[in-house]
Amino acid sequence: MAAAVLMDRVQSCVTFEDVFVYFSREEWELLEEAQRFLYRDVMLENFALVATLGFWCEAEHEAPSEQSVSVEGVSQVRTAESGLFQKAHPCEMCDPLLKDILHLAEHQGSHLTQKLCTRGLCRRRFSFSANFYQHQKQHNGENCFRGDDGGASFVKSCTVHMLGRSFTCREEGMDLPDSSGLFQHQTTYNRVSPCRRTECMESFPHSSSLRQHQGDYDGQMLFSCGDEGKAFLDTFTLLDSQMTHAEVRPFRCLPCGNVFKEKSALINHRKIHSGEISHVCKECGKAFIHLHHLKMHQKFHTGKRHYTCSECGKAFSRKDTLVQHQRVHTGERSYDCSECGKAYSRSSHLVQHQRIHTGERPYKCNKCGKAFSRKDTLVQHQRFHTGERPYECSECGKFFSQSSHLIEHWRIHTGARPYECIECGKFFSHNSSLIKHRRVHTGARSYVCSKCGKAFGCKDTLVQHQIIHTGARPYECSECGKAFSRKDTLVQHQKIHTGERPYECGECGKFFSHSSNLIVHQRIHTGAKPYECNECGKCFSHNSSLILHQRVHTGARPYVCSECGKAYISSSHLVQHKKVHTGARPYECSECGKFFSRNSGLILHQRVHTGEKPYVCSECGKAYSRSSHLVRHQKAHTGERAHECNSFGGPLAASLKLV
């Protein structure tokens, strides 16, 4: 194109014709298959850029004027008001994609309030100069679409500028949604057939009808699609077909990067960012941006599930959900990641996965600024700020912020352990627990403490261990002020104050505050001792008991008193010892007011008041309040004298033995 025209062109007004390249039949046949695919990809990319930009030009107030410039046989008509070039071509096949872009521009123009230009003999108003020229030719009696080869031209407007609102027919006063609809209506009303082919002199009311007729008249299709074998009149229509095969999504949302096939889908999507909500559920008050989302949501209240899977019988409220579910049975994964080759059954899953490679996190929390790659993760995160826990356990009334947490919690009541270790056959209620357990068999300890070099199989175990070095106890009980290094330990501790004991033993009816305590307790009934010492073969019902026992063999005493330097094999023994230095006696007897440094000492003391003697001798039936007293008594029956005095010797010892 001439440099003068390029300089004069308004930069913000972009047409797809500016970036589209036409091929004749002869030129197309010279291209190799790879070159044709390259042509398709380049044209699709150009179309995506034009469709995404969507620039428009505001009408000016000057009186209308026209300028014409001839460039390589193409008549360029420029209107001063719009600042746009309208191209007048020799007869070509109408381009459906360009027509779609025009309709898109007109649709977007319906949302804008721009001043329109008034021209012509009948003082009608037009938003597009192409429509103005078409209308003028009705007054002049000209045919606007003419397919002859003698140079007669027609105005083909595909400029993506967006002006105006309504299109009104002056003859009948009828309002139509776009200029093409108005033009078609007027030609029908006036009995005008403005599109004529010179070979047969047949006229048509629409350019698309002329184009179809020309293809029938010529009896040949010039361009074929390799994907489906169909033939087309021009490269533009071929490109339209190939867009379908290529799954083109030319409309991109700039804030989050999502892409869509249609402009209407992009407009609906943008309501998410604007916060526009117009459809509210009367049952629960939940609001939705789109009406069809509300209708889908309402099926949850009615419980209707019309779509049933023929493989497993599972029912769904939506057909698309059923289609997605059926891919579980077929194993279909048609969406491949171009970076790592990983395949997915849903395009949405692929989009989410690709954000791992790009690092994109489009969903940002407006409270703390933290960003997420998935919207559902943001929703879950925001519940930390709001404190919302919408998922309630019907058994114990406990609330959860995520449905997955409720499902995991529900297994406590049902006892379900769906995850099995293939090595030892052990079952687990959580998949994460199974993964951690497998490291026992593999011996994998990939997480190493930088302070002491100790290795762990789980990252969270390493994090918990590192608190030993820092001494941090960030989790404090609001009732008693006691601090803990782990949040779950604080939660367990708080049950002491609330008295909550939701876990019941099915054998004896005893209740426990923690599920782990119930599991350990049940070993009393079963007699299970799964933890064996590899030194002496002694078995224990608790893993912690085995660890303490092994220190007898190793001599390890890791817990040292900072006051006197005395060392102990367990932290509980050290805590009890420190009370000697502090004089703390926190456990008080409610009967006599006596204080004790250890809870076990208080329990033994209370038996003095209650007279309880739970330890009974199996030989004579004598009962004792302490197990140590029973053990000492039983030696009288066995004759065992384990402790011999070697301090005395000589005649005195001999005389004592005689006695």
UniProtKB/Swiss-Prot annotation:
Belongs to the krueppel C2H2-type zinc-finger protein family. GO terms for molecular function: DNA-binding transcription factor activity, RNA polymerase II-specific; promoter-specific chromatin binding; RNA polymerase II cis-regulatory region sequence-specific DNA binding; zinc ion binding. Induction: Down-regulated during embryonic stem cells (ESCs) differentiation by retinoic acid treatment. It comes from the Eukaryota. Keywords: Activator, Angiogenesis, Chromatin regulator, DNA-binding, Metal-binding, Nucleus, Repeat, Transcription, Transcription regulation, Zinc, Zinc-finger. This is Zinc finger protein 304. GO terms for biological process: angiogenesis; DNA methylation-dependent constitutive heterochromatin formation; integrin-mediated signaling pathway; negative regulation of anoikis; negative regulation of transcription by RNA polymerase II; positive regulation of angiogenesis; positive regulation of cell migration; positive regulation of epithelial cell proliferation. Expressed in undifferentiated embryonic stem cells (ESCs). Expressed strongly in colorectal cancers cells (CRCs). Expressed strongly in ovarian carcinoma (OC) tumor cell lines compared to non-transformed ovarian epithelial cells (at protein level). Expressed in lymphoid tissues, thyroid, adrenal gland, prostate, pancreas and skeletal muscles. SMART domains: KRAB, ZnF_C2H2. GO terms for cellular component: nucleus. It holds the Pfam family KRAB. A zinc finger (C2H2-type) spans 89-111, 115-139, 251-273, 279-301, 307-329, 335-357, 363-385, 391-413, 419-441, 447-469, 475-497, 503-525, 531-553, 559-581, 587-609, 615-637. PANTHER family: ZINC FINGER PROTEIN, ZINC FINGER PROTEIN 587B. Probably part of a corepressor complex containing ZNF304, TRIM28, SETDB1 and DNMT1; leading to promoter hypermethylation and transcriptional silencing. Probably associates with Polycomb group (PcG) complexes; leading to trimethylation of 'Lys-27' of histone H3 (H3K27me3). Interacts with USP28. Gene3D superfamilies: 6.10.140.140, Classic Zinc Finger (3.30.160.60). Deubiquitinated by USP28; the deubiquitination leads to the stabilization of ZNF304 from proteolytic degradation. Acts as a transcriptional regulator and plays a role in gene silencing. Probably forms a corepressor complex required for activated KRAS-mediated promoter hypermethylation and transcriptional silencing of several tumor suppressor genes (TSGs) or other tumor-related genes in colorectal cancer (CRC) cells. Also required to maintain a transcriptionally repressive state of genes in undifferentiated embryonic stem cells (ESCs) by inducing trimethylation of 'Lys-27' of histone H3 (H3K27me3) in a Polycomb group (PcG) complexes-dependent manner. Residues 14-88 form the KRAB domain. It comes from Homo sapiens (Human). It is found in: Nucleus.
